[in-house]
Structures are given as C-alpha cells and as structure tokens.
Amino acid sequence: PIHSSAASDVYKRQVLCAGAVQSPQILELSGIGNPNILRQYGIEVVHSLPGVGENYQDHYMVRQTWEIKKKITLKEQTRGVSLIREALRYAFTRRGIMTYPAGILAGFVRTRPEIATPDVQYHIAHASFLDVKKRILDKHPGMTISPCQLRPESRGSIHIKSSNPEDQPAIKGNFLAEEIDRRTLIEGMKIAKRIASAPALKDFVAKELNPNEEIQSDDELLDFARERGNTVYHPVGTCKMGSDPKAVVDDRLRIIGMQSLRVVDASIMPTLTSGNTNAPTIMIAEKAADMIKEDEVSLR
C-alpha cells in the first residue's frame, strides 16, 4: 500500500488496480479519502475525497433447492464407478462433469412487465448442497435455482478499520436495503418456484426443499433471502467515476484533484453491470491503457 514513507509516490504517475475491495483500502491508507475516517485511525490527510469506499454494489443471490426423483444429478455422477468413469472421460477427452462451471445453465427474466430488459438472472445447477461453503452435496438428487437481482439500488461501503495494511477492510454490503431490491428478489424467487412446479418438470421434481413448501408469503421469502442469500462476488463502485461530490475519478480515470494517479479496475464503475463484471473490467483496462498512451504522447 501507498502509506507512511511511500506517500510521496502518490505524486508520481501511478496506476492503482487492486480491485473494488482493496483500491479504496489502499487509497485510505495513503491518506486519500474521507478526512473523518482517516483521522479516526491516525492517518494524515493527503487529499480529501469523501467518495472513496462509498457506493459499494454487488450482485446478491439466493439458492433455492428441490429434490429430484431421478438419479440424473451431480450427486450420482460423483460417486463410485461413475466418478472413475468421469475422471477417465476428462483425462482422455477433456469432457464431462470435470469441465462444468459453477452454474451450467442460466436464464434471464423480467419480474415486471413494464420494464424493458430482464432484472433477474437465474444460475441453475443439477445439484443441491448440504453445505455450500464446503461444497458438500445433499444426500439425495437435487436441483438448485438461484435468482440474482441484476441492477440493485442498495449501496454499501468498504473502508479501513485500522491503519494496519495487513488488516482486512470493513465491508458493509447493505444488501436489500431498498424496497425495489426486496420486491425484485421476492418476485424472482416466486418465478423460480413456478418454473420448478411446471408440468414439464413433474416427472423430475419430487419436492421443494429450501425454502420449503410452507414458506410462501412475501415476508417469509424475504426472511429466507436475508438469512440464506450471499454475494456473487461482483464488487464494484467504491472509487466511482463521475463529477458529483461522491465521485473519486474523472472521465479519464484520474483521481479527482490528483492528475498523476489513476484507478483502473471495477471500483470505478458508477453502477453495477447487469451481468458478470469480468468483461467490463477488461474493457476498462484496455480503455485506460489507451488513455495513458495518449497522455504520454501529449507530454512529449
């Protein structure tokens, strides 16, 4: 991090590319950010910029699971002889379950007819998990449909919680704080329920597991979403581009008020893209490279 004795390096040409979590952390440790936060941890204010670490956005997802009647899921494919067969298949053909991504199927829906584009994405897998974090499968064949709100309105923050660069920053997601986010996710969960109960799936779906069939009201679904939901790990926005008081970089990705320092990563996105953030971040990097080259030419 650019802090203490290295603070003077800020005034040279620098490009910060630490991501939406660590870019604001490094800036704050370097004395660039909200003076109130910096002084709280004894950090000298080099440059006042209240927007650093604000405007945090991420996709929020809820896993809904069903038990499947037929033995056609990932559970059966990763046991005994089937697992040996799949391992050999991958070794010789580079195909099969060992090539599967986290979600093998996706779908996009509009939760309200008046909106022009989808506002929910489904991540679908032919498996359900007893413990998602440890990747332990359920004891029965299962299916997971995970609605994810694409354009959340809720905003959180990422800030340092000490002057020690080894300490992780405080991440406040503030998910589902806005009513539109709550309504959208609830509707997304209801649509997932309707998909799983469609006539075309009656020979496959045995029963609803989580949330179970007794959880039907909006309040119950929201409680389930709050308890079981999690991030999709698409953090953006904490050093946002713009011209308002909370903007951190200008339209050439330079720290506002510091012409020699740029931020080039997903943190500069003013709003979250309605999909994965990898490709947009590559675009940001390529655009920034062109800007840097243009600036070098103009300085010669």
Residue ranges and their predicted role:
Residues 1-11:
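Single conserved hydrophobic/aromatic residue that forms the stacking wall/gate
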Residues 12-29:
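Short hydrophobic core segments
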Residues 20-22, 32-34, 197-201:
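Acidic glycine-/aspartate-rich tracts in secreted/extracellular proteins
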Residues 26-47:
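Glycine-rich beta-alpha-beta "Rossmann" dinucleotide-binding loop(s) and their flanking helix/strand
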Residues 40, 46, 55-86, 91, ...:
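Rossmann-like dinucleotide-binding core of oxidoreductases
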Residues 68-72, 85-280, 288-300:
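FAD-dependent oxidoreductase catalytic-site/capping-region signature
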